[in-house]
Structure formats: C-alpha cells, structure tokens
Regions:
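Active-site environment of divalent metal-dependent phosphoester hydrolases
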Residues: 10-15, 39-41, 65-68, 119-121, ...
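Short, glycine/charged-enriched secondary-structure capping and boundary segments
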Residues: 18-21, 46-49, 72-75, 127-128, ...
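Acidic, His/Gly-rich catalytic cores of divalent-metal-dependent hydrolytic chemistry
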Residues: 160-243
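Beta-strand-turn-beta hairpins that frame and shape the catalytic cleft
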Residues: 1-4, 106-113, 176-181
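N-terminal active-site segment of His-dependent metallophosphoesterases
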Residues: 1-54, 227
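Active-site neighborhood of phospho(di)ester-bond hydrolases with catalytic His/Asp-centered motifs
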Residues: 6-7, 31-36, 57-62, 146-151, ...
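Anionic-ligand binding region
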Residues: 132-173, 178-182
Length: 243
C-alpha cells in the first residue's frame, strides 16, 4: 500500500490543491493528514473541506486544537492568535465539529501518526534535532516502527536503535530492520526550510520505502488572499521565501 502523508496545510488552499494534484500521479492508496489544517492562511474552510474528503484520517494539530477550543493558546504571539480567532469565527459548524473530534494519535500496525513528539501528545513538543529525537529512546518499547510527525514545518528523518539516534539525510530511503524511525514530513502550506515549494511524502508499506517530495504552487495567489484578509502580512511574505 502506498500512503500519501502530508501536514501543516495552514489554510493554504493553493498549496493543498497542488499537493493533491501531485499525489494523483503517485498511485496513492490512502491519504493521511498529520494536522494543522488551519492557522496562518486565508482559506480555512476550503482546506478543511478538501482534507475531509480525501484523507482516510486527520491528526489534531496544535492550531486545530486552539481553534477548536481544545487547548489554551495564550502563549501564541499576537498575530498567530489573531489568525486563530479569525478562523474560529469563519469555520462552518461542520468543520468546527470535525476539528473538535480529531485524534491526537492514530496507530495502524507498525505505523504511528501524531502531530508533534509521541511523548506528551497534548504538549505538541517539537522534534527537529537529534537531541530532541533522542528523548524518544525513553519510550522505545512503545514506539511504532515508523512514527510520522509534523509541527516543525521541516523535512527531517531520524533512525533510532535502542541506544543511538542519527539523522537520515536522504530524501528517499528504505526502512532498515532493527531500527525505528521518526519522520517529520514538512509543511504543505508554510514550509520553513528555505524551499518555498509545498512538501508531501509517500510511504510504501510493501517496499518499506519512504520519500520526500516537493511541488511548486501559486504562492502569489495564496499570499494575495492573506494580504486581503485581516491577517499579518508576514504570513504571506514568508511563503515566497519558504521560512
């Protein structure tokens, strides 16, 4: 089975549509969204509608949790809170109820899907370094063979043995025996790795291969919608830079 995995759409329908179109040529059997459908961008309902239609399941992200009233988001900076408040007002009742019901984690066989670190799921902790990934050695026995995460907006992979963690730098690789993996799948709608293309990924359960993919999209169209909305202009400007 080929699973199309993506995360951190952040209300960017232009990027999401480009990713969905790109997936169509990849013989995908199932789609999974790892959260943060909303926040930052100008098209929260449109993104919810598409993801509800295509994804087999969606994981709760921190921005989703904030909009749905499932977490205290007072620690967010002012512009991010403003976007969350705006999206909470804009979402249809159906989309709001959907966000309220999203799970923190889904496990399927030897695969785990969660938005942030698999430790303390409700805390949405980041993993973008070997040091942060090393904390997962504490829960080695509970880890799936592959744990897919989002949250950092970075494309990062870490391979774990029982006593060691190292970063995997390849964009396509085979899951090796006697190892476990934590894979951060990047961001569809707000990449932060200085590559402004939307990120999406593919995991083949038969071949046991994982691959990062990128696709260009109408950044100007997405940014112009942000500029026209009651949103921080920098949320649009940063799309051009991928930061």
């Amino acid at each position: 089975m080929r699973i199309g995995i993506f995360s951190d759409v952040h209300a960017n329908i232009e990027a999401l549509n480009a990713v969905v179109d790109a997936f169509k040529s990849e013989r995908i059997d199932k789609y999974v969204c790892i959260g943060d459908v909303v926040g930052y961008g100008a098209s929260p309902n449109e993104c919810c509608d598409v993801i509800r239609k295509v994804a087999a399941f969606t994981i709760l992200g921190n921005h989703d949790a904030a909009v749905a009233g499932r977490m205290d988001y007072s620690y967010y900076y002012d512009a991010a809170r403003q976007a969350l408040d705006l999206h909470a007002r804009q979402l249809t009742p159906q989309n709001m109820e959907w966000l309220k019901g999203l799970p923190y984690e889904v496990r399927e066989g030897d695969l785990t899907f969660c938005h942030g670190s698999p430790i303390n799921l409700e805390e949405f902790e980041y993993i973008f370094s070997v040091e942060q990934a090393s904390r997962c050695l504490e829960i080695w026995d509970e880890l799936g063979v592959v744990t897919f995460i989002g949250h950092s907006h970075l494309c990062k992979s870490f391979a774990l043995t029982r006593d060691e963690v190292f970063e995997v730098v390849a964009t396509k690789f085979v899951i090796r025996p006697e190892h476990k993996y934590i894979i951060s799948v990047g961001s569809v709608g707000q990449p932060r790795d200085y590559d402004n293309r939307a990120s999406y990924t593919i995991y083949d359960t038969d071949e046991r291969t994982f691959e990062f993919k990128r696709v260009a999209y109408d950044i100007d169209g997405a940014a112009q919608k942000i500029f026209a909305a009651d949103l921080e202009r920098n949320f649009g400007n940063r799309l051009f830079l991928g930061v």
